[in-house]
Regions:
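A conserved beta-strand-loop-helix scaffold within acyl/acetyltransferase catalytic domains
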Residues: 2-67, 118-259
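A short, internal acetyl-CoA/4′-phosphopantetheine-binding micro-motif in the GNAT/acyltransferase core
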Residues: 81-92, 147-148, 251-260, 288
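Short catalytic-loop micro-motif centered on adjacent basic/acidic residues
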Residues: 114-115, 176, 281-285
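Short, high-confidence coil segments that cap the C-terminus of an alpha-helix
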Residues: 40-42, 108-111, 279
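A gly/proline- and charged-residue-enriched helix-loop-helix capping module
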Residues: 76-125
């Protein structure tokens, strides 16, 4: 078996994508963009045995300096989105060998832990991966099967959504795909939308993030805008398109129009657009933190199809991981380790209720 971590410029990365059903999150261009804005070194674990392959895009990051560890350790994680392992192997035993090879190569690279976000549409089957690997299911996501007929697609849309879409059309709102003239307005409205919904910090992005995303992804990125009958921009969404999968990436609505829910019209039109272009799936994603919240219920109004979002938490070097967690706990005695947070030593320090910082 050939197995090693490769860089985005390695031709084998592109060869895998040419042979496999994949998503935009597997593209080297996406990982490069993520590295710039999330931090870390863009890499992918690559393994090949016979005609089978296994690819896992990650960002390799140095350990937090506050831990004061002098060893050349680091960790690796999936970037924002749904990269996850990509393979053409469907045999559980051989997949387990591929995964074991990934852990071995990570250890040789002094990677202490791996945090992998699986793609809900391309997840691995259930595997026996040992006690140092935890596979956690977080919740459902919503997707549209674009192989369905127009009638089936329309029937799957919740009646309340259909009513509001008809009202928007009657009032003269319209959708234009790839109208990049409104992109700057979208970027401004995105920040205001995040403020309005009290989004957590990780959902805020700089202006450079958006412009770099457009430059880096090029034809794989699409922008849909909603305008009034008078031409005023009121809402916009970013979509990615790769490997027959369209992802609903980011969305925003101008404050004064958010009660009209123009994004419902935008998504209905975008689903039809994606189907006309020959795509297989339109993935709307899930709720915040994969919860079945108001965001999830909004998305669920477009389709009855569900998939599951899960993560893989891998302790590559258990002794080092235990030591790093102990060191973190000593440095932050007022903050209990949060169950389920991985890797634990990257948890932000917050005093327990009633204690001063």
């Amino acid at each position: 078996m050939i197995r090693e971590f490769i860089s985005p410029g390695d031709p084998r990365w592109r060869e895998v994508l040419d042979r496999a059903v994949h998503d935009v999150y597997h593209l080297p261009e996406y990982i490069v963009h993520a590295a710039k804005h999330e931090g870390g070194t863009p890499l992918a674990f690559y393994a090949q045995a016979g005609g089978e392959f296994f690819l896992v895009p990650v960002l390799k990051r140095p350990l937090p300096e506050t831990l004061g560890d002098s060893r050349p350790l680091c960790d690796a994680s999936s970037p924002y989105g749904y990269p996850g392992p990509l393979t053409n192997c469907d045999d559980p035993e051989r997949l387990e060998l591929f995964f074991a090879a990934c852990v071995e190569a990570a250890s040789e690279l002094q990677i202490c832990t791996l945090f992998l976000r699986q793609n809900p549409l391309l997840s691995l089957p259930e595997l026996r991966l040992g006690s140092d690997v935890d596979v956690t299911s977080h919740g459902p996501t919503v997707y549209v099967d674009l192989a369905q007929s127009d009638q089936q697609l329309a029937t799957n849309v919740r009646s309340g959504h259909r009513y509001e879409i008809r009202r928007l059309v009657k009032e003269g709102f319209c959708v234009v795909m790839d109208e990049w003239q409104a992109y700057a307005e979208f970027i401004k409205s995105y920040a205001k939308t995040m403020h309005r919904v009290s989004a957590s910090e990780r959902y805020y992005f700089s202006d450079d993030y958006f412009w770099d995303l457009k430059q880096q992804l090029g034809p794989w990125l699409h922008f849909g805008a909603v305008r009034t009958s008078g031409g005023q921009y009121v809402a916009g969404s970013l979509f990615t398109e790769s490997g027959g999968i369209v992802q609903y990436h980011l969305s925003a609505t101008v404050d004064e129009f958010h009660r009209k829910s123009p994004t419902k019209l935008l998504l209905q039109q975008a689903i039809g657009w994606a189907r006309q272009r020959g795509n297989r799936y339109f993935h709307l994603g899930g709720g915040l933190g994969a919860q079945e919240d108001s965001l999830f219920r909004f998305k669920a109004g477009f389709s009855k199809n569900r998939s599951t979002f899960s993560t893989m938490r891998v302790v590559v070097q258990s002794a080092a991981y235990g030591e790093l967690n102990r060191r973190w706990a000593q440095q932050n005695p007022r903050t209990p380790l949060q169950a389920g947070f991985f890797p634990a030593y990257r948890q932000q320090a917050h005093p327990v209720s009633g204690q001063a910082a």
